[in-house]
């Protein structure tokens, strides 16, 4: 059974029979984990083992584990700083900022790979315009060249640990005040003005970025649809103009920014038709079941091949990782850097 185009979430710290049934549906392809799914390192490792044993090829397992306000797993994991901390270090010393970003990318990815997570939806490529509260210090910097530089080094660290990177939120969520979890933001800037926000994505595509997540934001001077449902953005700009050949993941279809596209099956069909390879349905298992049953078309073979490249590689066991000099050095350096509050931001 090949990977399907739907990524689902779980209710708790162990699989229920209903979840087992949903995850073996031919249209299921992945699982996204949240803080509610984490109790301890041992529990998480066992949960991942169960998920991986459900089918072949194994389901993708993802998490939002950026650091700062967005870090799903806590006890036992390194407390990671917000991306803005690397931008601050970069402003003082470019080389140190780059090295810290690379080290944090490796540390985040190595710890997740050690428990069986395939990838994190990171790094954030949005610009720190000082407008968006939901982005805020999740962005590396206000300068697109600096964002691209730091994100490149962060991604290289992830890759060294055996993890593919997913940049978000194309073509840029940093220029709107509204939070797309709560409303449908509208960006009224001209295409020329948006170029600065797109630049980090363009650079990262050239550097070999494996995945991209579009924003549930309308860029009204370009297209009337939110970017995650827009063939203008996903096929015209991202695939054709930027030459992106990796995976396009929708943002969560349960967000308010997706409601304009109809019911959940309609949202999923619209996102896939526009160019997404996989759609996320979170916090509404009954709607996830509807989406799975509503997608009649066979998965796109090209999308299946893209998704297969998102599986993690080279994972060490937790003991092997924490015994390594590289982990001990990276953890000490990153712990000394971090001063951000750790809280759950529902993104």
UniProtKB/Swiss-Prot annotation:
Keyword Cell division in record: yes
GO biological process, one term: regulation of cell shape
Pathways per UniProt: Cell wall biogenesis; peptidoglycan recycling
Site entry: Important for catalytic activity: 179
Listed Pfam families: Glyco_hydro_3
Gene Ontology terms, MF aspect: beta-N-acetylhexosaminidase activity
Keyword presence, Acyltransferase: no
Keyword list, A-Z: Cell cycle, Cell division, Cell shape, Cell wall biogenesis/degradation, Cytoplasm, Glycosidase, Hydrolase, Peptidoglycan synthesis
Chief localisation class: cytoplasm
UniProt enzyme class: hydrolase
EC numbers on record: 3.2.1.52
Cellular component aspect of the GO annotation: cytoplasm
Enzyme active site: 181 (proton donor/acceptor), 251 (nucleophile)
Binding site for substrate: 64, 72, 138, 168-169
Annotated SUPFAM superfamilies: (Trans)glycosidases
UniProt-listed InterPro entries: Beta_hexosaminidase_bac, Glyco_hydro_3_N, Glyco_hydro_3_N_sf, Glycoside_hydrolase_SF, NagZ_Beta-hexosaminidase
Catalytically driven reaction(s): Hydrolysis of terminal non-reducing N-acetyl-D-hexosamine residues in N-acetyl-beta-D-hexosaminides
NCBIfam families: PRK05337.1
Record-linked HAMAP family: NagZ
Similarity remark: Belongs to the glycosyl hydrolase 3 family. NagZ subfamily.
Protein name (database record): Beta-hexosaminidase
Organism: Thioalkalivibrio sulfidiphilus (strain HL-EbGR7)
Gene designation per UniProt: nagZ
């Amino acid at each position: 059974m090949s990977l399907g185009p739907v990524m689902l979430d779980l209710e708790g710290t162990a699989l229920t029979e209903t979840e087992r049934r949903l995850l073996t549906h031919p249209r299921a392809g992945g699982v996204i984990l949240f803080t509610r799914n984490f109790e301890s390192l041992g529990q998480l490792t066992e949960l991942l083992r169960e998920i991986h044993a459900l089918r072949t090829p194994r389901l993708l397992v993802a998490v939002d584990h950026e650091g700062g306000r967005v870090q799903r797993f806590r006890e036992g994991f390194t407390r990671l700083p917000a991306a803005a901390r690397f931008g601050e270090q970069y402003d003082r010393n470019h080389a140190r900022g780059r090295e810290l970003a690379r080290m944090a990318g490796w540390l985040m990815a190595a710890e997740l790979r050690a428990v069986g997570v395939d990838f994190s939806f990171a790094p954030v490529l949005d610009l720190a315009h000082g407008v968006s509260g939901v982005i805020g210090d999740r962005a590396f910097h206000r300068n697109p060249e600096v964002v691209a530089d730091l994100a490149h080094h962060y991604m290289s660290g992830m890759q060294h640990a055996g993890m593919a990177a997913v940049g978000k939120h194309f073509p840029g969520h940093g220029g709107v005040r509204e939070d797309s979890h709560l409303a449908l933001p509208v960006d009224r800037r001209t295409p020329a003005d948006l170029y600065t926000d797109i630049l980090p994505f363009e650079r990262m595509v050239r550097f070999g970025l494996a995945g991209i997540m579009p924003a549930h934001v309308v860029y009204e001077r370009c297209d009337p649809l939110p970017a995650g449902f827009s063939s203008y953005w996903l096929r015209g700009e991202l695939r054709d103009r930027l030459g992106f050949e990796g995976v396009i993941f929708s943002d969560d279809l349960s967000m308010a920014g997706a409601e304009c596209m109809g019911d959940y099956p309609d949202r999923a069909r619209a996102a896939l038709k526009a160019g997404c390879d996989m759609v996320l349905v979170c916090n509404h298992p009954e709607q996830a079941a509807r989406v799975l049953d509503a997608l009649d078309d066979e998965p796109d073979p090209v999308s299946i091949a893209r998704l297969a490249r998102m599986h993690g590689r080279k994972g060490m066991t937790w003991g092997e990782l924490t015994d390594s000099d590289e982990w001990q050095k990276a953890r000490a350096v990153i712990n000394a850097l971090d001063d951000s509050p750790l809280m759950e931001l529902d993104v």
